[in-house]
Design a protein with these regions (language model features):
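Feature captures hydrophobic
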Residues: 1-122
Length: 122
């Protein structure tokens, strides 16, 4: 499995945890309805639809309300596995969050929750 596939799987798991974990829906309900587009460099786009506190990965990336853009696969993996803090990633231009800030901030909390839950299982 290459890094992009691992990142996609990690984000899919984060979306699943947001919908099923006791803490996940509380976070997801803080997000506005619409789309969040997760980008990894120029090679990977993962659109996530948010509707009434439920997240789903969809095919259409058009018209996102927020964009969470990782500079490359290495930066994305480091952030998604909590090896790099979002603050340092932003300072060093590894993470760019645009659009509706509450969507980006909440998604950040969701991916950190996913890391915590996935780490507990291992």
């Amino acid at each position: 499995m290459n890094k992009r596939e691992m990142i996609r799987l990690r984000i899919e798991r984060a979306v699943g945890i947001a919908n099923t974990d006791p803490e996940g829906p509380k976070l997801a309900r803080k997000m506005a309805n619409g789309k969040l587009l997760v980008k990894v460099g120029e090679e990977l786009q993962i659109p996530i639809k948010v509707e009434n506190g439920t997240l789903a990965i969809v095919d259409d990336p058009s018209h996102p309300r927020a964009i969470c853009a990782f500079s490359d696969a290495e930066a994305a993996w480091a952030l998604l596995t909590n090896s790099l803090s979002p603050y340092l990633a932003t300072v060093h231009r590894k993470l760019d969050q645009m659009g509706l800030s509450t969507m980006n901030e909440t998604f950040e909390k969701i991916w950190l929750l996913a890391h915590e839950r996935l780490d507990e299982k291992n």
